[in-house]
Amino acid sequence: MRWLDKFGESLSRSVAHKTSRRSVLRSVGKLMVGSAFVLPVLPVARAAGGGGSSSGADHISLNPDLANEDEVNSCDYWRHCAVDGFLCSCCGGTTTTCPPGSTPSPISWIGTCHNPHDGKDYLISYHDCCGKTACGRCQCNTQTRERPGYEFFLHNDVNWCMANENSTFHCTTSVLVGLAKN
């Protein structure tokens, strides 16, 4: 193992004598910027990647189909704690699906909402439905736990339809992801 130590020491000394700190920082910076174009660097799920998953968390007490229509179409419904837009359940879709003629955005924002029925917090993924003009019904602008714009994946004032071919916003769905963990 002594030979490995000597080899490592001579290699590091050689590099230190032949390069400057600025050149090393420049090389690392080029590598990071270059990799941003090749590798996904944003914490979002892309539609082509099949990032959506079903956690099985939509059991009977959480199923929006079992809640009455007035409750689901209200901004006070527990799943809508971070919605900024029109509820798809008022626009021809459901709490979890886009209306016909619109497509879900492949990127979304998330929120943690408290379910008063079981006292637990749940992670909710909000997807904008795009491709049709704004619905205009059931406008909600809730900002529970919203973060500043520089934490954009937790910020609900962004037009998330910008990832679609047709970036016209129509409405927003509230998809239950699972239990929030501390």
UniProtKB/Swiss-Prot annotation:
Entry-linked Pfam families: Me-amine-dh_L (PF02975)
**How many and how are cofactors bound here?**
Uses a protein-derived tryptophan tryptophylquinone (TTQ) cofactor.
Q: Where is this site: Transition state stabilizer?
A: 172
Please tell me which positions the record assigns to the cross-link Tryptophan tryptophylquinone (Trp-Trp). Answer: 109-160
Q: Where, in this chain's numbering, is substrate bound?
A: 84, 156-158
Post-translational modification, as annotated = Tryptophan tryptophylquinone (TTQ) is formed by oxidation of the indole ring of a tryptophan to form tryptophylquinone followed by covalent cross-linking with another tryptophan residue. Predicted to be exported by the Tat system. The position of the signal peptide cleavage has been experimentally proven.
Q: What exactly does this protein do?
A: Oxidizes primary aromatic amines and, more slowly, some long-chain aliphatic amines, but not methylamine or ethylamine. Uses azurin as an electron acceptor to transfer electrons from the reduced tryptophylquinone cofactor.
Q: Report the sequence similarity comment from the record.
A: Belongs to the aromatic amine dehydrogenase light chain family.
This protein is called Aralkylamine dehydrogenase light chain
Q: What organism, scientifically named, is this protein from?
A: Alcaligenes faecalis
* Higher taxonomy: Bacteria, Pseudomonadati, Pseudomonadota, Betaproteobacteria, Burkholderiales
